[in-house]
């Protein structure tokens, strides 16, 4: 079949026009036509020219009269080439050569009727998402919508979005899989080049080299190379030479402490926590903070003491029970109500009562937990420093139920007026009554009393005066441990009574402050007793006299009012041996006591 072609110049001009139209953005105005019916069946009035926005972007004005002329001269765009000729021939050529591709610019004089678009949409996308049908055949009566679907590479807006999403998802999955595969990169042993099982001793290594290095650093490792210390260590020959294998372990960086911080075992973390707890407790004790939850010393601390005393292993309740059992019995005085009081008679009654109480005090001290673990020198030293304080706190405790009076014995109850018969006794009486009133106001319990009494015994000689002529304590550390134990027992009693932490702190401070007043009263009483001795008002008994002389040796030289003569070494040795002999002589076995307890 032959076709008539146009000139070359006109063909090139039309080609440029078509290329320009294809490159224009698809933002053409919508198809302008009068709406005579609902969408889907739209009729064009033949009397009015109408503007069509064709898919390729070219706008044409036509009416029914000009349709035939336009159809006769419409150019045809084909896939195999560009040809220009009459409309009928061009339509036949275009249909035969393009197949399913749409025919452009073929116009019919008959009215245009748009039908519902098929499910397959146009490959040409409208800017506003409208679906525009495309036309293939030149029919004399009307334009028909081709039912054949568009090519596979053309899709609607929604289909494109779904397809793009699926493509992005699949590409991201492929990238993620590639990253995971690269993360799971196979690692090899730095020693023998076998597959590594993990990070061991600072390097990536297999199980065999890890176990070999562990055995080598923990046990016998004096290996000898049978060759020149240059053996090849690989997967197959790693067991041939232990010396070269160990050498290579060190060369690649294996070390005993080479453990990753995030792979520390439970045992190592447990040891680290124990170390931190011990350091924290030491810092806490150094700063003087009060113990909170755990009142007892740590076993790690007790282990380093000079003596592992059984008293340090007692619980709070066991300590209280032991102190209550050790309490001495009540002692009756030789008071005769038929005889009036005088200075000599009252001092004789009081000194005789004190001398007998000293005997029971020695027996009580030996039963205090921790006191019997001390050597004889320290036991004598503590008793010589605290004997009058112990007698006074016992007197104050017995007098709590008798306001304004002092109960020296069950048959000897004295008030302030009766104490005036002894020179200088009223001041000491007033201090004793004030302390008894303080105990009564605080509602002191018997368990707290025995703890305070033991604290007085153990704390009296710890801080020896620099001017003292006797040597100080030899086992101060052990004494401090026992003191801490008794103090913790006192706190336990307060917590057991239901006191809050703040109330416990306040009550403990108040009780310890009372001990300082008792120390002051003891010093006043010692001065008064020494003055009575110097005036020969009353004879002193042997044990009481020894205690008084020993106290003068422990006290500063200026305390007694008159400067004492410096004792000789013979006097010091005699006093020390006499006191020690007195402690052993006046010791009463517990089974020999037949008197009721004071508590």
From Swiss-Prot:
Residue numbers spanned by region Interaction with DDX5: 35-178
Region entry Disordered, spans: 147-175, 557-581
Region (Hinge), start-end ranges: 255-314
Region (Required for interaction with NCOA1): 35-47
Outcome recorded upon mutating residue 366 to A: Greatly reduces transcriptional activity and estrogen-induced interaction with NCOA1
Range of residues in the leader sequence: none
Annotated region (Modulating (transactivation AF-1)), positions in chain: 1-188
KW Nucleus (keyword) present: yes
Segments forming domain NR LBD: 315-551
Annotated region described as Transactivation AF-2, given as residue ranges: 315-599
Intracellular or extracellular location(s): Nucleus; Cytoplasm; Golgi apparatus; Cell membrane
GO CC aspect terms: cytoplasm; euchromatin; Golgi apparatus; nucleus; plasma membrane; transcription regulator complex
Consequence of changing residue 380 to A: No effect on transcriptional activity and estrogen-induced interaction with NCOA1. Abolishes estrogen-induced interaction with NCOA1
Stretches the record annotates as Interaction with AKAP13: 266-599
Mediates interaction with DNTTIP2: annotated segments: 189-314
Quaternary structure (record): Interacts with BCAS3. Binds DNA as a homodimer. Can form a heterodimer with ESR2. Interacts with coactivator NCOA5. Interacts with PELP1, the interaction is enhanced by 17-beta-estradiol; the interaction increases ESR1 transcriptional activity. Interacts with NCOA7; the interaction is ligand-inducible. Interacts with AKAP13, CUEDC2, HEXIM1, KDM5A, MAP1S, SMARD1, and UBE1C. Interacts with MUC1; the interaction is stimulated by 7 beta-estradiol (E2) and enhances ESR1-mediated transcription. Interacts with DNTTIP2, and UIMC1. Interacts with KMT2D/MLL2.
Family, similarity comment: Belongs to the nuclear hormone receptor family. NR3 subfamily.
Protein name: Estrogen receptor
């Amino acid at each position: 079949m032959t076709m008539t072609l146009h000139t070359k110049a006109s063909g090139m001009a039309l080609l440029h026009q078509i290329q320009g139209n294809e490159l224009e953005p698809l933002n053409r105005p919508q198809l302008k036509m009068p709406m005579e019916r609902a969408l889907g069946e739209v009729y064009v009035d033949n009397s009015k020219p109408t503007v069509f926005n064709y898919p390729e972007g070219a706008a044409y004005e036509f009416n029914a009269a000009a349709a035939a002329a336009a159809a006769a001269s419409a150019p045809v765009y084909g896939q195999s080439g560009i040809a220009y000729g009459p409309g009928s021939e061009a339509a036949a050529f275009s249909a035969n050569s393009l197949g399913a591709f749409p025919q452009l610019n073929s116009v019919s004089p008959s009215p245009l009727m748009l039908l519902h678009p098929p499910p397959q949409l146009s490959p040409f996308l409208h800017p506003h998402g409208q679906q525009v049908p495309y036309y293939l055949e030149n029919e004399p009566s009307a334009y028909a919508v081709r039912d054949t679907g568009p090519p596979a590479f053309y899709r609607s807006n929604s289909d494109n979005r779904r397809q793009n999403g699926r493509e992005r998802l699949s590409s991201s999955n492929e990238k993620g899989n590639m990253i995971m595969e690269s993360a799971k990169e196979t690692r090899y042993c730095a020693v023998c080049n076998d597959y590594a099982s993990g990070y061991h001793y600072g390097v990536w290594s297999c199980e065999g080299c890890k176990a070999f290095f562990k055995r080598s650093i923990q046990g016998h490792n004096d290996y000898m190379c049978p060759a020149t210390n240059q053996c090849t260590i690989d997967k197959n020959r790693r067991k041939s030479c232990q010396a070269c294998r160990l050498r290579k372990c060190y060369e690649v960086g294996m070390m005993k402490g080479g453990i990753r911080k995030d792979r520390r075992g439970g045992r190592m973390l447990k040891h680290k926590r124990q170390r931190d707890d011990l350091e924290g407790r030491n810092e806490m004790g150094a700063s003087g903070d009060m113990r909170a939850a755990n009142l007892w010393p740590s076993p790690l601390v007790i282990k380093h003491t000079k003596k592992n005393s059984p008293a340090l292993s007692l619980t709070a309740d066991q300590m209280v029970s032991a102190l209550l059992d050790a309490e001495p019995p009540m002692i009756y005085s030789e008071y005769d109500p038929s005889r009036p009081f005088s200075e000599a008679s009252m001092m004789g009654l009081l000194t005789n009562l004190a001398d007998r109480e000293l005997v029971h005090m020695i027996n009580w001290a030996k039963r205090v937990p921790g006191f019997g673990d001390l050597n004889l020198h320290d036991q004598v030293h503590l008793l010589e420093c605290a004997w009058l304080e112990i007698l006074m706190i016992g007197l104050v405790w017995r007098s709590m139920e008798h306001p304004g009076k002092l109960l020296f014995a069950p048959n000897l109850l004295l008030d302030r007026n009766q104490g005036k018969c002894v020179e200088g006794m009223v001041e000491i009486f007033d201090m004793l009554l004030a302390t008894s009133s303080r105990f009564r106001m605080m509602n002191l319990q018997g368990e707290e009393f025995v703890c305070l009494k033991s604290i007085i015994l153990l704390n009296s000689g710890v801080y020896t005066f620099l001017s003292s002529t006797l040597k100080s304590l030899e086992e101060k550390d052990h004494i401090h441990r026992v003191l801490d134990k008794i103090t913790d027992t006192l706190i336990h009693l307060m917590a057991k009574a239901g006191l809050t932490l703040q109330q416990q702190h306040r009550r403990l401070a108040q009780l310890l402050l009372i001990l300082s007043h008792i120390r002051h009263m003891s010093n006043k009483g010692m001065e008064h007793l020494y003055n009575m001795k110097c005036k020969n008002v009353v004879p002193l008994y042997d044990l009481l006299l020894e205690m008084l002389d020993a106290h003068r040796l422990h006290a500063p030289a200026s305390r007694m009012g008159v400067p004492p003569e410096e004792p000789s070494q013979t006097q010091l040795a005699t006093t020390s041996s006499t006191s020690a002999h007195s402690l052993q002589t006046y010791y009463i076995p517990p089974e020999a006591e037949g008197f009721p307890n004071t508590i």
